[in-house]
């Protein structure tokens, strides 16, 4: 009896480990696709926002969900459209991003409050959370790295603004003080960029 009980816990641990690795690999692959196809990703997220808006309107018309919950959901989708304007470059300190994070919390609070008072089967509650609360923030979360330069980029020496100002576009001539400053800059603050 105890041996089978021990085996069941061991198998549960192994299954959770495999599921975790599969989800991590899937998220990694999804992030790679998003980085490669940012225009298509932006279009897909836009369609997801429109779909979520249609679901919210359908819940209001057919299911008589509370006006406050639907109104906050529609306003959140409007904020998501604002985030989509600068996609894939999402600033974590922008008011739009901070507002969207706050609205996600407010939406969850309103949903928990509503579903605590009204009975709905678990599958319907999960459908609401999936389509109206989770799918769009998850898409933005997975695509956060799309705006970053993950791999080091290449540049020619003196390709920055200061070098162009001092040399006035003359690549062959280097001023003495500029060489010293370039050396100090690379010694103190080495860049990740390869210089050819």
UniProtKB/Swiss-Prot annotation:
Bilayer topology: Multi-pass membrane protein
GO cellular component, one term: endoplasmic reticulum membrane
Domain of life: Eukaryota
InterPro entries reported in the protein's UniProt record: Svp26/Tex261
Keywords associated with the record: Membrane, Transmembrane, Transmembrane helix
Residue stretches spanning the membrane: 3-23, 42-62, 70-90, 97-117, 125-145
Main location: membrane
GO molecular function list: COPII receptor activity
Localization in the cell: Membrane
Listed GO biological process terms: endoplasmic reticulum to Golgi vesicle-mediated transport; positive regulation of apoptotic process
PANTHER family on file: PROTEIN TEX261 (PTHR13144:SF0), TEX261 PROTEIN (PTHR13144)
Family: Belongs to the SVP26 family.
Stated name of the protein: Protein TEX261
Organism from which the protein derives: Homo sapiens (Human)
Lineage per the UniProt record: Eukaryota, Metazoa, Chordata, Craniata, Vertebrata
Gene: TEX261
